[in-house]
Amino acid sequence: MIRKDAKRSALVLFSGGQDSATCLAWALERYETVETLGFDYGQRHRVELECREGFRNAVARAFPAWAERLGDDHMIDLSVLGAISDTAMTREIEIEATANGLPNTFVPGRNLMFMTIAAAIAYRRGLQVLVGGMCETDFSGYPDCRDDTMKALQVALNLGMDTRVLLETPLMWLDKGDTWRLAHQLGGDELVELVRVETHTCYVGERAELHAWGFGCGECPACRLRKRGYEAYLSGEKVTEAPV
């Protein structure tokens, strides 16, 4: 059961991927008004960004009650982040582990910048809650996806803006199978199908082939994790190890 908080309004960091789409549905079920925020930071492809409008429109058609709560969409040009980042998310380079153990898909400072800009927009728009799809359980180990990071950032933003914005991360302790299950809990098979078809996760931007779990190359870490999560969702298992 999702506890509704009808007195609050939220801003969802919405990239067009599976996790942020599930968070959008979570927020639409919970809050009175929900706006969305995306960033163009010089990603190596724009496929995920191009999915944003399609998913918003599809959700509004499929769930009339949510359509009434779905507010404005905001797109921010953050190309400076791509200009200062040398990662597999912003360059056409092979995806691999780095010397510090993190995959080279990690974009330093990305979520810190995203949340700071989101907080500034929320301040101006009178929104009380920021919702992000960060989690500690997807095996990537990104430090800016950790619960401690988000809690510290909430304190810093509230001190720096003299406000009381709340940072919500509904996927923080869920594995990818649990994320599919949450989508089903929120909107049944219809929402699961929208997430499967209308969102994009693949690091290389492949959208030519529709697999059981969605579009993608099927080989990059993001595709393998999404596939493993979907299989775990169908079987009722937990995703207890990194997919290979």
Swiss-Prot record:
It comes from the Bacteria. It catalyses: 7-carboxy-7-deazaguanine + NH4(+) + ATP = 7-cyano-7-deazaguanine + ADP + phosphate + H2O + H(+). Its cofactor is Zn(2+). CDD domains: QueC-like. Binds 1 zinc ion per subunit. It is an enzyme of class 6 (ligase). GO terms for biological process: queuosine biosynthetic process. ATP binds at F14, S15, G16, G17, Q18, D19, S20, A21, T22, C23, L24. Pathway: Purine metabolism; 7-cyano-7-deazaguanine biosynthesis. Its EC number is 6.3.4.20. Keywords: ATP-binding, Ligase, Metal-binding, Nucleotide-binding, Queuosine biosynthesis, Zinc. Catalyzes the ATP-dependent conversion of 7-carboxy-7-deazaguanine (CDG) to 7-cyano-7-deazaguanine (preQ(0)). Belongs to the QueC family. This is 7-cyano-7-deazaguanine synthase. The gene is queC.
